[in-house]
A protein has these predicted regions:
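Solvent-exposed beta-edge/loop recognition patches
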Residues: 130-367
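Short strand-edge motifs at loop-to-beta-strand transitions and within beta-strands
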Residues: 9-11, 52-54, 157
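A structural motif detector for short, solvent-exposed N-terminal "entry" segments of globular domains
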Residues: 58-117, 204, 213-227, 232-256
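Short, acidic Ser/Thr/Gly-rich low-complexity loop/linker segments typical of extracellular
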Residues: 1-10
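The feature marks short-to-medium sequence segments in extracytoplasmic or secretory-pathway proteins
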Residues: 106-140
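A short, solvent-exposed beta-strand micro-motif common in secreted/extracellular proteins
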Residues: 15-31
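Divalent cation-coordinating acidic motifs and surrounding scaffolds
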Residues: 43-48, 74, 79-82, 149-152, ...
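Structured interaction patches on ligand/partner-binding surfaces of diverse proteins
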Residues: 27-57
Length: 378
């Protein structure tokens, strides 16, 4: 039964002993909320009246509604064999819930240092100085969308992080970002044209992310080897007001040096994150995201066209009504011993009309694998 406006549901049952349960799913600003409750041992007698009410207390659990489905940062080999090309980065966000997601004051951030194997000034005696401080430091600056971002249930958006153009016209191993849904482009703050050529005309200017820079540099240099990337919402505070508030700024033992300036993003604001370690620097790499945000890391071999791609939640996906006969198995896009343990080819299944539920345990070691081809090339 469905409850009325007062939260009541009515049943007509014979006398006996019953168990009542209730559940509800809601979504708000990038999160899914599941409310569940159960009450056992309800004795219904012949004298029971309509005035008798049984209350079922609901317990709330929260999960990410909008998740990072894919992060492509490693670049590819140039056609002439002269080296690698790395100005074609993108991220795909996916609505992993059953409700439409509308995100207000939506932002992109990355953690200093840019590479996991670099010296991390925030480590003190082997522990991150902010490990228990309920924030994540966003380095250099943040990108924010000046309007709401809406993603329908089971749908995705592509954000070009560099070069919202068709890179394959020059480098055939690259990707076409001229058809991206959104892009980062703010030439006043980040003017380096290698990173930010004029975006494709097919991307509306209203879909440009704007930058707020509190550090230094002519580009927002997301690592092509081992970034720590996250998405967040500033909720009731505008991104400009938040990012300009010097009370949130700090420089991690480099006082007065704007190169190291970060701003403290409250962990409650963070919607999703992924930490990447370089395969070549694995032994020297250290975590920058705290366990509450991402308890693990995924490994990347860069410059080969590989991408960090989220694993499928096999049980949840197979349980989706209507998926039978639409799911494609025998996934073969894994590489270097890394693959999706579900065996489901998510991209092929999506094209076949299936609804994919991705795994989200807040642990990139479990949630991601290295895919040998960017999904935009499928």
């Amino acid at each position: 039964a469905t409850t009325d406006a007062n939260g009541k549901a009515a049943f007509t049952v014979p006398a006996g002993i019953y168990e009542a349960s209730a559940s509800e799913k809601r979504a708000s600003n990038g999160y899914s909320f599941i409310l569940n409750g159960v009450k056992s041992g309800i004795t219904v007698t012949e004298t029971w009246t309509g005035d008798s009410v049984v209350e079922v207390a609901l317990t709330e659990s929260k999960s990410g509604q909008v998740i990072i489905k894919e992060l492509y940062v490693g670049g590819c080999q140039k056609d002439d064999g002269s080296g690698n090309y790395q100005y074609d980065k993108y991220v795909i966000l996916y609505n992993n819930s059953e409700q439409a997601a509308t995100l207000e004051n939506f932002c992109l951030g990355m953690v200093n240092p840019y590479n996991a194997n670099s010296t991390i000034n925030d480590y003190k005696d082997g522990v991150l100085s902010y490990a228990n401080d309920n924030y994540i430091p966003a380095g250099c600056g943040i990108w924010y969308l000046p309007r709401n971002l809406t993603i329908e249930a089971g749908k995705q958006v592509v954000i070009a992080l560099n070069g919202a153009i068709n890179h394959t016209l020059t480098y055939s191993n690259s990707v076409n970002l001229s058809t991206a849904d959104y892009c980062t482009y703010d030439i006043e703050d980040f003017s380096q044209t290698n990173y930010y050529p004029t975006p494709s005309e097919s991307i509306p200017t209203a879909n440009y992310f704007t930058a707020y820079k509190y550090g230094q540099g002519t580009a927002w240099v997301l690592s092509n080897q081992s970034p720590a990337f996250f998405i967040f919402s500033t909720h009731d505070v505008t991104p400009e007001v938040f990012a300009s508030n010097t009370d949130y700024h700090y420089t991690a033992d480099k006082e007065g040096n704007a190169v190291y300036r970060c701003t403290k993003v409250p962990t409650d604001w963070i919607l999703d994150a992924v930490e990447v370690f370089s395969q070549a620097q694995l032994a020297k790499s250290q975590k920058r995201l705290t366990p509450a945000i991402d308890a693990g890391y995924t490994v990347l071999t860069n410059a080969q066209g590989y991408t960090s791609y989220r694993n499928v939640d096999k049980q949840a996906t197979e349980a989706v009504e209507g998926n039978s006969g639409k799911l494609v198995y025998s996934y073969n896009y894994g590489t270097d011993g890394s693959t999706d343990p579900s065996g489901i080819d998510a991209e092929a299944s999506l094209k076949n009309g299936a609804r994919i539920i991705y795994q989200d345990t807040n642990n990139s070691t479990n949630d991601f694998h290295q895919r040998k081809q960017a999904s935009l090339r499928d």
